[in-house]
From Swiss-Prot:
Cofactor(s) required, per the database record: Mn(2+)
Pathways per UniProt: Carbohydrate biosynthesis; gluconeogenesis
HAMAP family per UniProt: PEPCK_ATP
Record-given protein name: Phosphoenolpyruvate carboxykinase (ATP)
Any GO molecular function: metal ion binding
Catalytic activity: oxaloacetate + ATP = phosphoenolpyruvate + ADP + CO2
Function, in words: Involved in the gluconeogenesis. Catalyzes the conversion of oxaloacetate (OAA) to phosphoenolpyruvate (PEP) through direct phosphoryl transfer between the nucleoside triphosphate and OAA.
Binding site for substrate: R59, Y201, K207, R328
GO cellular component: cytosol
Record has Cell division as a keyword: no
Species of the source: Porphyromonas gingivalis (strain ATCC 33277 / DSM 20709 / CIP 103683 / JCM 12257 / NCTC 11834 / 2561)
Recorded family membership: Belongs to the phosphoenolpyruvate carboxykinase (ATP) family.
Amino acid sequence: MSKLDLTKYGILNATEIIHNPSYEFLFEEETKAGLEGFEKGQLTELGAVNVMTGVYTGRSPKDKFFVMDDTTKNTIWWTSDEYKNDNKPVTPEAWKSIKKLAVEQLSGKRLFVVDTFCGANESSRLKIRFIMEVAWQAHFVKNMFIRPTEEELANYGEPDFVVMTASKAKVENYKELGLNSETAVVFNLTEKVQVILNTWYGGEMKKGMFSYMNYLLPLRGMASMHCSANTSMDEKETAIFFGLSGTGKTTLSTDPKRKLIGDDEHGWDKDGIFNFEGGCYAKVINLSRENEPDIYNAIRRNALLENVTVDAAGKIDFGDKSVTENTRVSYPIYHIENIVKPVSKAGHAKKVIFLSADAFGVLPPVSILTPEQTKYYFLSGFTAKLAGTERGITEPTPTFSACFGAAFLSLHPTKYAEELVKKMEMVGATAYLVNTGWNGTGKRISIKDTRGIIDAILDGSIDKAPTKAIPFFDFKVPTALPGVDPNILDPRDTYADAAEWTKKAKDLAERFIKNFVKFTGNDAGKALVAAGPKL
């Protein structure tokens, strides 16, 4: 048993502490006989274990709170009537009760403690310690965060932040504590502790630390970004891909011709781009070996599937969305062959790609943005929310999520835009808006065409292509690109009647204009209005 002292966190009488367990140990633990309910893992035909997370098959943004105190009162971007977001305040008194529930749940139990890093750059990384009573949750964070070397573990010392996952505890008196439900995902930035109660969804542990990095880094002059990143084989040409869940961040950055830096969360400092994580969390709905070979091949021993349909013999049905559309797999990043080693970081990004899945069928498959349009569309963060990545959303509906990640922004969105643009200007980067959604055919733009577009951006051929302007949005779009169907580049050409596009375009333009009003409270925001759509 580990000599680790958990009493300093209030956790008493642990019957056993399994500190930094190996993958082999975790595999035995999560598949052993006698486990019940959501603790139980099932071995699948691909060698990966599958777990179910119950009613929470996505994050629960309505249950996310920060303790409002002297540390956070003037720094956090709090939700308001004018601009609602997920950063809801809870009192220091309520925090005591919430933390007590977690501590009581974890006391007297056999516990797993996993020490990790968040951030690939030694100068800015954080030491994050996770404490939980469920083996597969320990496996999840071992996959998703950066695994310290033996030597780094020996000198780990005290963590910078502690996460207590107590999925079996629920907040019965949530109303009097000012919470939303029996489930709580609460951060205390003064104590540097996060508590997770009554949800089993793995993504809460991952995204919690993203919210924390999003708090710290911009205050230290770094860009903190909800994006994937890759670089050329010689590691000289880096690109970053912003986009909300389901727009293609993981799929498009996992490219056999390039090296992956990471698939979801990155920082950008004076030296370049660095990953926060040590793993990937890919959506696997309708996954096939043909369409996404790299992700498919990453699903093997030590990968962890979530909410996938598996029969008694271990056979997987990736097409079944009866539990959720948000089926996932987490795997350590080295399950992908082409990665940047030994540290997930590379130089500055010259290509910045905004991915948007437009359910309206209005946006061109690719537009070359001006610097002002870059700020405008980054702050707008448009996509159509795709089915099932959060509870209660199943149809495509338009979403404007600032910086392509409003759910994880702890500071005001303009702070992130400012840091990103500063870095882009420093290296002369260009931004491109890529629509991975639908067009006038009623079908989604093919992954083959989208990959062709990405290739043209990365190899620079888009910058030499002839272009034209698209009305209302004044987007500069190429009229021909190698390997891309020329008939889709102007979205109007995909409609039997171009008037149909015009009608939809006016509607979408109006939505952009209306959404952007919330950024016009200061001169910088007002100045950007001209870069947006005009009716």
